[in-house]
Structures are given as C-alpha cells and as structure tokens.
Regions:
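Short, solvent-exposed, mixed-charge loop/turn linkers that connect secondary-structure elements
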Residues: 182, 186, 201-252, 287, ...
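Transmembrane beta-barrel architecture of outer-membrane proteins
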Residues: 52-54, 94, 143, 312-314, ...
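Small/polar (Gly/Ser/Thr/Ala-rich) solvent-exposed segments
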Residues: 38-52, 66-90, 94, 98-132, ...
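Amphipathic alpha-helical coiled-coil segments
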Residues: 3, 13-30, 133-158, 167, ...
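Heptad-repeat coiled-coil alpha-helices that serve as dimer/oligomer scaffolding interfaces
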Residues: 188, 195-198, 202, 411-414, ...
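Outer-membrane beta-barrel architecture
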Residues: 58, 98, 276-279, 318-320
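Bacterial Sec-pathway N-terminal export signals of envelope proteins
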Residues: 1-54, 99-120, 131-134, 145, ...
Length: 442
C-alpha cells in the first residue's frame, strides 16, 4: 500500500521521471541537425552604372549517410559587370541540383550522427537514474512504515503495563484497608501509575511523529500526504525461522549485478564514450569529398552566344588534410582516458555491490536469530512477571518485586519490537542491495 503510493505519486520520483522528457528533448534537438533547410536570398543593385537584380531560393538536406543533397532556383537580371557574368541567367532563371558525399572522413560517422547517437544513448541513460531513485525511495518508505508499526507496538506494550498497575490499585487499596499491607505500598503503586502514564505519553508522541513521517510516502490518488491513524496499525510481522547454517547465496550477487542500475548506467556511459572515440578516430582521416551538380537555365537566352542554354554538369573532388592532426589525436587520448577511468569505477562499484549484498545477507540472518532469542526472553519474562503477580495476590511477594518483574517483561517486549524492526529494515536493505525494486512489475 505504502510502496504503491510511492511509485504512483511521490514527488521526488516524479521529478526524476522528467529526466526522460529532458533526454527526449535533447535527442530531438540532435535529430534537428538533419532537418531540411530552406534558404533564400535577394541581392539588388538598383543604382549605379551596373544595375543588377539577383534572387535565389533553395533546399539543403543533410544526409544520414554523410554529405548533403541540395537543389535550388536562381534568377539574375540586369547589366552585370563583365567579371560577374556567371551571375546572369536566362530570362526564366536557372534550376540547379547536386550532391556532395564523403569518401574518407565522415563516411561511417560524422559530427551530426555522433551527436544523435550520443543523445539516443543519453535517453537510455536517464532510466538508471530513475531506477536508483525508485530503489532508494522504496527503502526509505519501508523504513518509515515499519518504524510506525514498531511505534504502535511500543505504545501497546506501554499501555498494557500501565493497565496492570491501574488494575492492581484497587486490590492494593483493599489490602491496605484490611491491614494486610502497609499504606506506602498504595502510594508506591500510584507513583508507578504516574510514571507509566508519562511513558505512555512519550510512546504516543513517537507514534504520532512516525505517522507524520510516514505520510510523506503515503499519499492519496491526488498526491496529497495522508497521516495514518492508530486503527490502521497491524501487528509487526515475525520473520521465518532462521537457519544459522544457511550459506551465503552467491546467486544474489549475480542477480544484483544484473539488476542494479549503476551497472546499466556504466554500460550506457561506455556506449556514449565509444561514439566519441569513433568520431575522434574519424577526424584523423583526410577530408576527401566528391560533388556532382547539374544546372539548367530556362527562358530566353541572356546573350546571343546562348552560353547558358545548355545543361551544365560539374563533378569535383575536394581534399583537406590537417597535417599534425592534433585535434583528433588529443580527442582520442582524452576519450581513451575517460574509458579507462570508467572501467576502473565500474570495477569498484561491482565490488561495492557484492559487499552490499553480503552485508545485507548477514544483517538479515543475524537479525532473524536475534528475534528468536528475544522472543524466548519475552516468554520467560512474562512467565516470571505473571508468577510474581500471583505471589503478590497471595501475600508472598511485594510491589517492588512485581514492579521489577513487569519492568523486565516490558523491556524484553520492547527489545523484541526493536529486533523485529531491525529485521524488517535488514530485509529492506537486502532488497535495495539486490536492486529488486529497480523496475516496477506491471
């Protein structure tokens, strides 16, 4: 009930889930580098010896395989300088299309694709953070729930020993009036009642405070905190009978390494760095591109030579080589260093996960044994207290001995509550160490 409330409406977990929106937005922004671009220009010279009017519009499409394709239309009218005759077109203008493709650098990867792939991996990287938040919050909510249950048990114990003293008051009064015991016995019992009422008030305080703390995790469908009431308390659960000879389950460590989000996060971080390394290696190659264009003027010829009326096809090669390649080599060295650092951190985290699981297993096992022994102590203490009360009624004991026996029984009962709380906390620790709550089961 409490865990379902946390997974449904806890604000911190909801805030973590918005990381998905952030990552999705970054991925969309990276994909925007492949958007079709519309370009246009208008360049006019209405005054002067040469009056020229030039207008152009075109489309530019970056290709996912590298390079780009382009197409456009332009028209140039007026009296052009002799050295700018290529700006002039036939009366209907010029249509042009072409493609530029990489032959060495940017064939398998380029800056656009590297950014897109890194953003895609970054979107996956948001999930481990959400899972880590979920594990932590489930653990904290489990702690808060069992602390509230334990506070309720402590209140019941304190209330029970108070009623024992109150019920005994009438019997002691009648015995004093009959002259069987001295009057200070009645006064001492009144003192004991006052003391136990004070302890009950303190137990009530702890119960109310733990209920308020639990309301942080227990929320209604609208996400508003709900403070649980005392009538919603249930008895604190007893653990199964422990097996002191039960060996450490190594499969738990294997399961934790599969389920813990830290390992998944390292995997996606490594993929992002591998993309960066591939792009750095790509930059070590010469920039060698091929381009093919075709252009066709339409309309009335702009000159008697009709030199713009034929279909024009151009093919070209473009080469650019950074001699030292320091930018590429420097990036490669930096990324390789990051990969080595990430691998070292991953090994340490794996060791810590194994330690977490083993420590949680030990904690759960020993707390189970502690519960069993404490439960035995409670039974024996209650038996002694009941016998001492019988002796008091028979005149074979005094109030001091009864008080001590009841105090020992109450302390034993409280120790059992503490042991049970420790057990349930250890159980939550083991689930957290295993990463069992990383993914919600639909």
């Amino acid at each position: 009930m409490v865990i379902a409330s946390v997974l449904r409406s806890y604000p911190q977990l909801q805030a973590a889930m918005f990381a998905r929106n952030i990552a999705a937005g970054e991925r969309q922004a990276a994909a925007g580098e492949f958007d079709l671009k519309l370009k246009g220009s208008s360049d006019n010279g209405p005054a002067g010896f040469y009056e020229t009017y030039r207008h152009a519009i075109g489309l530019d499409q970056p290709l996912y395989s590298g390079g780009q394709a382009f197409a456009g239309y332009r028209i140039g009218r007026g009296d052009f300088q002799p050295w700018y005759q290529e700006r002039q077109t036939n009366s209907g203008g010029e249509f042009k299309a072409g493609v530029r493709v990489p032959l060495l650098q940017n064939v398998d990867i380029d800056e656009r694709r590297a950014a897109l792939w890194a953003a895609q991996y970054g979107r996956q990287l948001a999930e481990p953070d959400i899972q880590a938040q979920r594990i932590q919050l489930v653990q904290e909510a489990t702690y808060a729930y069992w602390e509230w249950i334990a506070a309720g048990e402590s209140y019941r114990i304190t209330d029970r020993v108070l009623h024992l003293a109150e019920d005994r008051g009438d019997r002691i009064r009648s015995q004093v009036e009959a002259g069987l015991i001295d009057p200070p016995e009645l006064t001492d019992n009144r003192r004991l009642i006052a003391e136990r009422r004070a302890k009950l008030a303190d137990a009530q305080r702890k119960l109310e405070q733990t209920a308020i703390k639990l309301s942080l995790f227990w929320r209604d469908d609208s996400g508003n905190p709900m403070i649980p009431t005392a009538d919603q308390l249930s008895a604190i659960a007893l653990p199964p009978q422990p097996d002191s000879n039960h060996p450490m389950d190594t499969t738990d460590i294997e399961a934790a390494l599969r389920q813990r989000p830290e390992i998944t996060a390292f995997s996606w971080q490594q993929k992002i760095l591998q993309v960066e390394l591939s792009q750095a290696e790509n930059l070590t190659l010469p920039e060698f591109d091929a381009m093919l264009t075709a252009a066709q003027d339409v309309g009335e010829p702009s000159s008697s030579k009709r030199d713009k009326s034929q279909l024009e096809i151009e093919a070209g090669l473009f080469l650019e080589v950074p001699i030292q390649r320091r930018k590429a080599l420097g990036k490669m060295a930096a990324v390789e260093g990051k990969l080595a650092m990430l691998a070292a951190k991953q090994e340490l985290v794996k060791d810590k996960i194994a330690v977490d699981v083993q420590a949680a297993q030990v904690g759960l096992q020993r707390s189970m044994e502690q519960v069993v022994q404490t439960q035995m102590s409670v039974e024996l203490s209650e038996e002694l207290a009941a016998r001492e009360r019988q002796n008091l009624d028979a005149g074979l004991s005094d109030l001091l001995k009864v008080t001590l026996r009841e105090q020992y029984a109450a302390e034993a009962a409280q120790k059992l509550v503490d042991a049970l709380l420790l057990y349930h906390r250890a159980e939550a620790d083991l689930r957290a160490a295993l990463g069992a709550d990383a993914v919600v089961q639909e």
